[in-house]
Amino acid sequence: MTRAGGVLIVLLTDAVPAMGLGRRKGDAMHAQVITFGLNGITEEQFRQASRADTPTFASLPGLLAKIWLRDPETNTYGGLYLWDDQEAYERYIKGEVFNAIKADQNLKNVESRDFGVFEDLSSLTMPKLRAV
C-alpha cells in the first residue's frame, strides 16, 4: 500500500489473469467511474462506513476491481470499477447496491459514467497489481 498526494494507492501483483487480460476476443471488460460529494458526514465517517461495506463490493458478481477515490479539497469521492463485461456492469447499475448508493442521504450529486476498455492496450500498460 502506498500513499501519493493524499491518495491511497493499492498495489496489486499477479492479477493479470484474474483481471481477464489475455481473454478471448469479444469478451470486453467494462469500466465505470462513480463520483459524489459527502453530505453531512466527515471523510473519516465515510471511510468507516465504507470499510464495513467492503465485503459487499468484494462479492459483487463480475467485479474485477474497485479503486476508492477521494479529493477532499473539492469534496469529490467515489470509485473506479473494472467489470468483467458490460453485462456485469449493467446488472450492478440495476441492482440493490448501486440503488442504495444513489439513495444514500449522506452522499450528494451521485454521478456514474461507463466506458469500454481497450483490453489489448491495457494489457501492455497495466502494472502488476495485487490487492492488499
Predicted regions, residues:
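Extreme N-terminal basic, low-complexity initiation segments
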Residues: 2-7
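A common structural junction motif
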Residues: 99-102
